[in-house]
């Protein structure tokens, strides 16, 4: 499993992202501990645990703490490179929406698109190795 930490600037303030990929059941505790560290509530931790231990392919999750400006995103294993790319784009969309909502940005506005691009650019060095 790869753990990637990236930071983007949003409205002049940092937003920290921890990404895990590709998930296996051996890494569930580390991911749950990371979610707990950003104050993921009990219900969401239980949902995340079920998601992470379900051994599902083409699956992910994204949780953000808007106050701490921290996100944990997880990309499970996938059935093929195209599906893995789809999974990454899907979870990055959730992440961009979380950041937009935390900053009162218009979801239809350009700012959200730039945020999505900043995230993609920051995560590219790892993602490019996994989409082959």
Language-model segments: residues:
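Non-catalytic terminal regions of proteins
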Residues: 1-53
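Generic hydrophobic, helix-prone segments enriched in Leu/Val/Ile
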Residues: 16-20, 95-100, 119, 123
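Active-site scaffold of zinc-dependent metalloenzymes
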Residues: 36-82, 95-98
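Short, solvent-exposed segments of well-ordered alpha helices
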Residues: 79, 83, 104-107
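Catalytic Zn2+-binding segment of zinc metalloproteases
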Residues: 92-108, 112
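Post-HExxH zinc-binding segment in Zn-dependent metallohydrolases
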Residues: 106-132
């Amino acid at each position: 499993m790869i753990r990637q930490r990236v930071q983007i600037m949003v409205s002049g303030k940092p937003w920290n992202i921890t990404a895990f990929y590709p998930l296996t059941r051996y890494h569930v505790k580390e991911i749950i501990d990371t979610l707990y560290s950003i104050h993921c509530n009990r219900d969401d931790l239980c949902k995340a645990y079920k998601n992470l231990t379900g051994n599902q392919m083409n699956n992910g999750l994204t949780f953000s703490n808007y106050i701490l400006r921290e996100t944990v995103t997880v990309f499970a294993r996938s059935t093929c490179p195209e599906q893995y790319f789809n999974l990454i784009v899907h979870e990055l969309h959730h992440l961009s929406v979380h950041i937009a909502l935390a900053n009162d940005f218009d979801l239809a506005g350009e700012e959200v698109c730039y945020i999505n691009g900043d995230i993609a650019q920051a995560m590219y060095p790892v993602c490019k190795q996994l989409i082959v």
